[in-house]
Amino acid sequence: MTRADTRSAEPVGRPWYVSALVAVLAALLLLGGVWVYTRIRSPFPYYGTVYDAPQQAAGVSGLSFTGGKVTPYAFTPGEGKTTAVFFGFTHCPDVCPATLAYLERARQAMTPAERAKFQVVFVSLDPDRDTPQRLNDYAKYFGDARSVQVKEPVLATLARSYAVSYVKAPLPGGGYQINHTSATFLIDAAGKKRLLWDVTQLGETARVLRDIRQVMNTPGNT
């Protein structure tokens, strides 16, 4: 009588290129899923960082310098203009001047009709030194931004509503600078925060302008 061989069969090795192909296909499926998910969340491929859902923006109330005198100023989100809001200070050595210059470059690239529907609001994080007149002189050097002095404690509340942090940092030999969040917030004509850019992104004028135009054309949407 013949006895059956009870030894388990040796596993057959899979060629390396088959394993590589399986790994590539798995990676492609994963990337495809990520791409579909991001397109569902935001069908338009924004350059800036998009809010998961548009958030109501906080208004800005303070003092500005216009017509040769200090006057009250209020930015009320939802009054019909697409608005870029940036928090900084006039003694800033790099981030603030770069941000204002980049935003002006994007504004200049717009059509006259687009410029009429767009504004930049520059909020000082250093109200002790940044008087309304100093702010106006500083902002106008870079372009057409409206600069605003907001006093404490209102400033702290406003900054928190935009998730902006800031702190005084002493300088060697005296004085101080303000360390702060370097984001610029884009608010649509319906008053919703739609996206933000970091200063490192703002130099890409064409891509920034593309974001602005999309937000202009879709107020209240994503």
Give the location of each predicted region.
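N-terminal targeting signals for export/organelle localization
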Residues: M1-S61, T218, T222
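Short loop/turn microsegments at loop-to-beta-strand junctions
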Residues: A57-A58, T82-T83, T181-A183
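Short, acidic, Ser/Thr-enriched surface-loop or helix-capping motifs
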Residues: S64-T66, D188
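Short active-site neighborhood of thiol/selenol oxidoreductases, capturing the structured segment around
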Residues: Y73-L103
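Structural microenvironment flanking redox-active thiols in thiol-disulfide oxidoreductases
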Residues: A98-L158
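Structural micro-motif
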Residues: G143-R146, A156, R160-A169, N179-F185
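Thiol-/selenol-based redox modules, centered on thioredoxin-like
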Residues: G173-T222
